[in-house]
UniProtKB/Swiss-Prot annotation:
Location in the cell: Cell membrane; Cytoplasm, Cytoskeleton; Cytoplasm
Cofactor: Mg(2+)
Name of the protein in question: Rho-related protein racD
Gene: RACD
Record bears the keyword RNA-binding: no
CDD domains, alphabetized: Rho (cd00157)
Modification sites for Cysteine methyl ester: C197
Organism: Entamoeba histolytica (strain ATCC 30459 / HM-1:IMSS / ABRM)
CC per GO annotation: cell projection; cytoplasmic vesicle; cytoskeleton; plasma membrane
Pfam families for this protein: Ras
Propiece residues: 198-200
Length: 200
């Protein structure tokens, strides 16, 4: 990352979703290239750094939020002036998937009615984890598919759907690259179907 001049455009991305879906891991892995060994709810400090995207200087701000109900009064304090919300769910948690439309969409729309959103499926490495698949099967469940994620994004009028794994870093950089480009209007993903923007 290179130093950005004072007139650089600011890009504010806010990550929301249920607790334990991997929001903090996403941010830590993206900014440090290291996967945290232990789960500690919301330990990531807001990350601000100058960088250059396609030759254009920007100041990138990444905001983590706590998904737990205990933080419902504090969480909205991070919402004002957000350029793009990343609504995250775990592909191995049907509850977190359902809560995107039943909880997180209404919450951010209440505070930021004209907000832009993208939907992000996390923990995609678990789709191939036999032990996890058996555990879900015991509960009469199965991992959320890419197609389900795409449909969710379309149903809630999100700009696009993408998915990634913080553990393997598969798709991780692409999620944030896409988010930054959406804010900077460098691509036309908002004019395409969510399927065009989905990352397999």
């Amino acid at each position: 990352m290179s130093a950005a001049p004072t007139d650089a455009k600011s890009v504010k991305l806010v990550v929301v979703g249920d607790g334990a879906v991997g929001k903090t891991c996403l941010l830590i892995c993206y900014t440090t290239n290291e996967f945290p060994k232990d789960y500690v709810p919301t330990v990531f400090d807001n990350y601000m750094a100058p960088m250059t995207v396609d030759g254009e200087p920007i100041n990138l701000g990444l905001w983590d939020t706590a998904g737990q109900e205990d933080y419902e009064q504090l969480r909205p304090l991070s919402y004002p002036n957000t350029d793009l919300f990343l609504l995250c769910f775990s592909v191995i948690s049907r509850t977190s998937f359902n809560n995107i439309s039943s909880k997180w969409l209404p919450e951010i729309k209440h505070y930021e009615p004209k907000c832009k959103m993208m939907v992000v499926g996390t923990k995609t490495d678990c789709r191939n984890d036999e032990a996890m698949i058996r555990k879900l099967a015991d509960e009469n469940q199965k991992p959320i598919t890419t197609e389900e994620g795409e449909k969710l994004a379309k149903d809630i009028k999100a700009i696009c759907y993408m998915e990634c794994s913080a553990l393997t870093r598969s798709g991780l950089n692409q999620v944030f690259d896409e988010a930054i480009h959406i804010v900077l209007n460098k691509n036309q993903s908002s004019k395409k179907s969510s399927k065009k923007c989905a990352l397999l």
